[in-house]
Every structure is written in structure tokens, then in C-alpha cells.
Amino acid sequence: MALKNALTGSVMQFTLATVLGDLIAFIHGHTILGLISPKDLDLFKDKLAAIRPQPVPDVSFCEDLDAMETALRLREALGRIFGAVPQFKKYVYVFPGQHPYAAIYAEKRDPQEYVAQVDYAYLKSLSPMSARTLSELSSLIPKVDCTVLSGEQLGKIQNFLHTNFLSSHPRLISYSDLAILSHPKLSKEEGSKYTRSAATAMSKNPVLLLVPCHLVISKPLYDEFRLQLKSNPNAVLKDAGKFRLGSDIKSYLMYRFGINVKRPA
């Protein structure tokens, strides 16, 4: 019901349109990974067609990965939290505002079934979330309640927050420390098989971003890619939006470091 009310509200409509449009783009890029079937994707897009935002802006002018990704991320959302375990096929968004809420979208389900509000006091009382984790979440999403979903999905988020990856990093990795796509071979040392994440800061407003099908790569690999991008941006960025969903970055890195012998087109 909260989602339905927000969709009809003039203030929140633009924000939701932007967020949901970005979600469509995100899901579309991951159908091959089995997160959602093409049939369900079409049904989902039909439901949201009336509130689609304007197209993603041209990013061919961007000099590096930071600028390119920043141009493509949501400006309205202070935080986005995705389900940590891919097979659950659920996505959680945290919106800005006085009364933020999280919405989960699951395959073959009505999105409105997955809307709930949980206040920060309740979140703080949960176990096994550590004080450190809560502190980091609070600092990343200032002046906004850390809103998550109750029940099953909340447990999955808690599971993720206690993976070896976050335990091994006292602070969440900043955007300049990583690229958000890679291959398991490159991040094998990071621990848990469910550790598929990236954390970033966008512009002057830090944003927590946990992406279920992405793996963090090492800083040397990321630096190498940035050098390639800066030295010959026209060759790397062949067209606007080429790396919008990251698949071409992944292909390039896999080829460059000998994981895939086939040169990307």
C-alpha cells in the first residue's frame, strides 16, 4: 500500500520513476545470470511503463570510470541495498525523505506485497548485526532511517553483513578502491561465496551499494583499467552507455588478465 500511495503522490512519483527505471535497466542486464526470466521481465516492464523516467544520459564524454558510473547512478536515492544472495531474486531500495521505506521486488510477485517500514530502533535491536555495521550504515545514509524489510529478507541482509568480506574491511570500500564487476577467480581470496558486493561513495553523498551478482576486484586491476580508460577513452568508450551494466568492463578485464582468451568485440 505504501508503494501504491507513493506512485500516486506528486512528490515521490519522480523519485520512484527514476528508481524503478534504473531497476529495469539493472534487471535487464542480468537475465542471463538467471536472476529473472525474460518473460517475467517483460511483465514487470509492462507494469512500470507508465512511470518510466527519461533515458539514461549520454556518458561518452566521461574521462574515467568514476565519472561514468556517477553519471549513471541515481541522484535521488541516498541508498540502495540489494539482496545478498542472488537466488532469492529480491531487491531492496532505501529512499530519501522524512519517512523512507524499502521495497522488495521478487520474481513472479506483486511488488506491493513486499513493502514495509521498520524504524531504526527496531533495526538496532536486531541480532546478529554488530554495532560497527550499524554505525557504518548510519554514516553512509545520514539523516535517513536505515530502513529494511522485516521477516525473511532481513535475515538475508544480516547474513551478508557478516560475510568474510565485510568482516575483513573495517570501513566499507570506497568507489575509488574498486571496480564493481569481475570474475570469481579475481576475488577468490575475499571469502564467502555469497560475497558479491561493492560499496561506493557517489559525488559528495556517500551511498551504500550491495549488488548480488558483482564481485569486488583488487585495486591493482581497477587501476589498470582506469589507466586504459584515461589513455585511450575513445577506444574503450565506443558508444554512450556501453559500460552501463558493466558487462563490457567484465569482458575487457577477463581478456586483459588471461581469464578469457577471446578478445571482446
Question: Where do the protein language model's features map onto the residues?
Answer:
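Basic nucleic-acid-binding alpha-helical/helix-turn surface characteristic of O6-alkylguanine DNA
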Residues: 2-188, 249, 256-265
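IMPase-like, lithium-sensitive Mg2+-dependent phosphomonoesterase catalytic core
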Residues: 173, 201-202, 233, 244
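Extracytoplasmic/periplasmic beta-strand context in beta-sandwich domains
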Residues: 176, 200, 214, 251-252
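Short regulatory "switch" loops immediately downstream of catalytic or recognition motifs
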Residues: 180-186, 216-226
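Regulatory, non-catalytic segments
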Residues: 191-208
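Short Lys/Arg-enriched helix C-cap and helix-to-coil transition segments
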Residues: 209-217
